[in-house]
Amino acid sequence: MTTTTLTLAQLIDETLDQLYYEIEKPRPLLLGAAIDASQTTLTVASNAEVATITDLLEAGSELMLITAKTDDANPTFTVLRGYSRTDAVAHAKNDVVLVNPYWTRSAVTRALQRFFTGAAPVWLPLIRAEMMNTVEYAGVGQQLIPLDSDVIRVLEVRYQSPTSGRVVNLPGWRFEDNLPSAVVSSGMGLRVPSTVSPSDDLLVSMSVRYAWSGSGEDATVDVPAGCEDIPALYAAAVLASGREVSRLELDRLTEQSSEQAARTGSNVGLIRLKWQEVYRRLDEARRTISVPRPLVYRRFQRGA
């Protein structure tokens, strides 16, 4: 499977572009001086009057709550660092600080992580193919191949002839996902028929979990090629609606009146449009992903 590597910062920016119109973006300020992760006071370069006590500041992915403000010409703000489960980090002079953002980067990050841990493995299977053989795992039995802990299911097992190189489907294999840790540390393994020789090469196709590499907004994740925009579309739709909306609910989701929109605190029509776009792109992307389907082999009964 061909994949594309995306960064968390890139996905957050794309999600915010889906949520904000240009005129709706929060007011930016510039830090007047560098601050470290433990400092609780800060200044801004200009326009300090737009921020006051109880306002929320966002610097990078960190949220800071203003608890006090001096009356000077260039006021000093006292802030609560690492507000709302964010990490306090150092910031340089002239770093951009947003005042009262409606959609925070930390909230977008949680929506993206929800997509990759829940919906993505089901909607957009990430397929990994590896060449394996049982000779490497003789210590746990030559008919059992241990698998990594990120494997969700085995989709296909094929045999490659060592002489002709021909690849054919192998019958009689079984994916074991509840093995004792004393046998396989990950608890998962591939059991192959006894006809397989320890030196035979097996081409195993597996559906695996999405995994982040790195930390912070520099973390990267691989997604199937052609699906690069779907994580941001999903995160924007979840944040706009407050939860995931199923296809069945879309058929019944209508904005009956402005009174209903005011009561729910959201634009029902906009929510419907966002989820329609998510499912439309999912349908398009899934047509480009070839997922191997396990072949069903039935034992031939003599005399039947």
Regions found by a protein language model. Give the residues of each.
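Catalytic Cys-His active-site segments of thiol-dependent hydrolases/isopeptidases
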Residues: 76-84
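Short alpha-helix capping/helix-loop boundary micro-motifs
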Residues: 39-46, 83-84
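Glycine-enriched, solvent-exposed interface loops adjoining structured elements
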Residues: 1-36, 48-64, 68-75, 87-304
